[in-house]
């Protein structure tokens, strides 16, 4: 009877949500003369042995952040573009994707553009981690170094491009309760020196994810993506990587479950609409209990305004219909819902005043 299986599906989704929060998925595109094609890696031990030392090290750096898995697509060493890799990743549910350690400015920009298109299409929601690309887009993390071009790990120096896999792995491995802000990169021993913190502040405000010497170690300055222009859709809070990750997760889980368990499987009655709403509310409540979204702030209901407009477009006169009548009206195959959630940020800015007696 009704849609109890939808409720079960959302419950299952909430459990998997917790798992995603503690270990996301990374996509890496590399070029190599060996091991062409796709590889799904669960640990450094599964990295193809015949890859070049640089490529193996690049993949290893992703695992420093403890992602759940790393999807690697190996292009021929002479490949001039990422077309074949894009075909592989077109429907893969990955959280962060980066290009090869020698990625050019053109390819980095192209990867950012590809991700933007995929996010707009709505089927998958990856985030690109690229070096020195001014994308002004929430789906791109622009990894930069302030005041120089290389960071040091002992005696070895790396460019931002060579360290994008490390950043992608770190971001993917974060629990959704925390942000990337001030997360340490313990292996990094030095970054370019800057004259003052204001220089770092300016870089962050320009949409750069940068490293910062906190005095006790090298950390991520603030967990931001490249979005700088705020709109009604791309709001101020979506500059934060953490906020976007939770929003993407909710969008994906709800969409997947509706497509799998609801679309085409039940009559579009008012009662079934209400059961779907109840299922979504149950899912959101579990996310509230995990601390991803604010408690008692989640709303999901029939969108009366859109439903009324739809009815009018089909020739139904709604002038004498109250809101409840509109909610219960026959809308063919269409379902119009609306909702809101309050995604919780992490503690990042603290102002303390202590009075001495």
Where are these regions (language model features)?
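A short, well-structured beta->alpha microelement
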Residues: 70-87
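Intrinsic-disorder/low-complexity loop/linker signature
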Residues: 37-38, 68-71, 148, 155
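Structured, hydrophobic secondary-structure cores that serve as assembly/anchoring elements
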Residues: 1-61, 67, 213-357
């Amino acid at each position: 009877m009704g849609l109890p299986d939808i409720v079960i599906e959302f419950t299952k989704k909430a459990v998997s949500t917790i798992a995603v929060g503690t270990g996301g998925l990374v996509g890496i595109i590399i070029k190599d003369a060996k091991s062409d094609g796709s590889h799904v890696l669960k640990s450094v031990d599964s990295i193809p042995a015949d890859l070049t030392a640089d490529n193996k090290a690049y993949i290893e750096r992703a695992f420093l952040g403890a992602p759940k898995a790393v999807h690697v697509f190996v292009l021929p060493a002479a490949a001039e573009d990422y077309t074949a890799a894009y075909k592989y990743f077109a429907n893969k549910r990955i959280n962060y994707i980066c290009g090869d350690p020698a990625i050019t400015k053109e390819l980095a920009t192209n990867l950012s553009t590809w991700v933007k298109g995929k996010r707009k299409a709505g089927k998958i929601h990856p985030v690109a981690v690229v070096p020195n690309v001014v994308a002004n887009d929430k789906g791109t993390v622009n990894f930069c170094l302030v005041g120089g071009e290389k960071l040091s790990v002992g005696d070895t120096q790396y460019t931002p491009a060579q360290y994008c896999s490390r950043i992608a792995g770190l971001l993917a491995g974060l629990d959704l309760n925390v942000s990337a802000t001030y997360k340490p990169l313990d292996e990094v021993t030095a970054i370019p020196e800057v004259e003052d913190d204001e220089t770092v502040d300016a870089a962050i405000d320009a949409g750069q994810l940068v490293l910062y010497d906190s005095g006790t170690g090298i950390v991520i300055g603030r967990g931001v993506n490249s979005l700088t222009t705020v709109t009604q859709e791309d709001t101020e809070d979506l500059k934060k990587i953490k906020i976007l990750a939770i929003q993407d997760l909710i969008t994906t889980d709800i969409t997947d479950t509706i497509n799998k368990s609801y679309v085409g499987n039940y009559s579009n009655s008012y009662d079934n609409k209400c059961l779907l709403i109840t299922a979504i509310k149950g899912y959101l409540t579990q996310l509230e209990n995990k601390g991803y979204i604010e408690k008692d702030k989640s709303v999901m209901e029939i969108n009366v305004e859109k439903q009324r407009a739809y009815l009018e477009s089909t020739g139904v006169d709604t002038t004498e219909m109250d809101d409840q009548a509109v909610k219960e009206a026959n809308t063919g195959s269409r379902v119009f819902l609306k909702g809101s959630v309050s995604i919780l940020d992490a503690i990042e800015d603290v102002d303390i005043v202590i009075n001495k007696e």
